[in-house]
Amino acid sequence: MKNASVITVGNEILKGRTVNTNAAFIGNFLTYHGYQVRRGFVVMDDLDEIGWAFRVALEVSDLVVSSGGLGPTFDDMTVEGFAKCIGQDLRIDEDALAMIKKKYGQADLTPQRLKMAKIPPSCRPIENPVGTAPGLICAVGGKKVIILPGVPKEMEALLKAMEKDIIIPDTHYYDDSVIIADVMESAFAPYVDRIMKEFDGIYVKSHPRNVEVKNPELEIEISGFGEDEAALRKKIEDAIARAGEYAVKLGGSVKR
């Protein structure tokens, strides 16, 4: 199984001004494309912090995806932080420069705009269909790093445009869930372990939807990865059925 990590960069996230929806979107996207997302980082706009996040993420990941810090301002330093991490210098990339010129038309190429065309040699730019700063796909010792803007619409559009570079053809992810009523999470907890032992390779997570001791209701989510999509789906569906059986055994009811 391939592992991935997600890095989001920005002081605005850490101080709570901006809700980190990018991490959720990227994590979901990677999971459904066959990756086990191992780690998530949120770091401030600081070269050392950014470089540290990439370095630690690359230790455990086949793919690292970052968002934020690609713009023209002084605190947009993700590319520089990544370059520092891998020991490369930034240089003007002609393809990236052409993308920037196309976006700004007759406007002057100020140092701030030119900054967005400076990338490490191991990266190639991907045109941003929504904004100005190109996204980057980088190769690092057999691993892959994708660097995206922080504006959600730009990030989402670029990530989808890079789908062919991300997808793992021989790995599938599937999940399903069942809602059970009148069973407390603490009462169902032993059966979570039992289901995971009975159906090897799946993950079972209980999500409380109400107060534990007053009208308890749980969503039991079951997920897994596998090479055989049909077999994986059947395993998950069988495990869902078993969860329902245990709920009834505990005096509850299945709402799904």
Curated annotation (Swiss-Prot):
UniProt xrefs under HAMAP family: CinA_A (MF_00226_A)
Source species of the chain: Thermoplasma acidophilum (strain ATCC 25905 / DSM 1728 / JCM 9062 / NBRC 15155 / AMRC-C165)
Protein name: Protein Ta0487
InterPro entries: CinA, CinA_Arc, MoaB/Mog-like_dom_sf, MoaB/Mog_dom
Annotated signal sequence range: none
Superkingdom, natural source: Archaea
Family: Belongs to the CinA family.
